Curated annotation (Swiss-Prot):
UniProt remark on cofactor binding: Binds 1 Mg(2+) ion per subunit. Binds 1 zinc ion per subunit.
Presence of the UniProt keyword Chloroplast in the record: no
Localization per Swiss-Prot or TrEMBL: Cytoplasm
Subunit structure: Homodimer.
Gene behind the chain: hisI
InterPro entries reported for this sequence: PRA-CH, PRib_AMP_CycHydrolase_dom, PRib_AMP_CycHydrolase_sf
EC top class named in words: hydrolase
Protein name from the UniProt record: Phosphoribosyl-AMP cyclohydrolase
Any GO CC annotation of this UniProt entry: cytoplasm
SUPFAM superfamilies recorded: HisI-like
Keywords tagged on the record: Amino-acid biosynthesis, Cytoplasm, Histidine biosynthesis, Hydrolase, Magnesium, Metal-binding, Zinc
């Protein structure tokens, strides 16, 4: 039986979140054993925030939740890909569909931002 290796990165693993229909990578976040289990049990994506040092469910503030369709691990069992149905217009806290909207072009990083919502009105911090 394969066991996910949480030890290589001090208890965390990268989680690549991918749109189940389009294949687009929506975001990359970190999970520990607890958040992976919460994700598998609830059918919603849960993560560990290294910045805020807390657990969080995707969409708990914005409403843009993610329904888990499929979970895969790599050959080393130290990373997961989670295919999801994205609920709401965007996965990124900036309001963009994907967190990957900055592209390297001609020697510089160029933002190709197309926010689908205003983060200032969604996140009341």
């Amino acid at each position: 039986m394969i066991k996910i290796d949480f030890e290589k990165m001090g208890g965390l693993i990268p989680a690549v979140i991918q749109d189940n229909e389009s294949g687009e990578v929506l975001m990359v976040a970190f999970m520990d054993e607890k958040t992976l289990n919460l994700t598998l049990e609830s059918g919603k994506t849960w993560f560990f925030s290294r910045t805020r040092n807390k657990y969080w469910m995707k969409g708990e503030e914005s409403g843009n939740t993610q329904d888990v369709v499929e979970v895969l691990t790599d050959c080393d069992a130290d990373t997961v890909v989670i295919k999801v149905k994205q609920n709401g217009p965007a996965a990124c806290h900036t309001g963009n569909r994907s967190c990957f909207y900055v592209r390297y072009e001609n020697g510089a990083w160029v933002e190709h931002s197309n926010p689908l919502f205003d983060p200032n009105t969604v996140y009341k911090k």
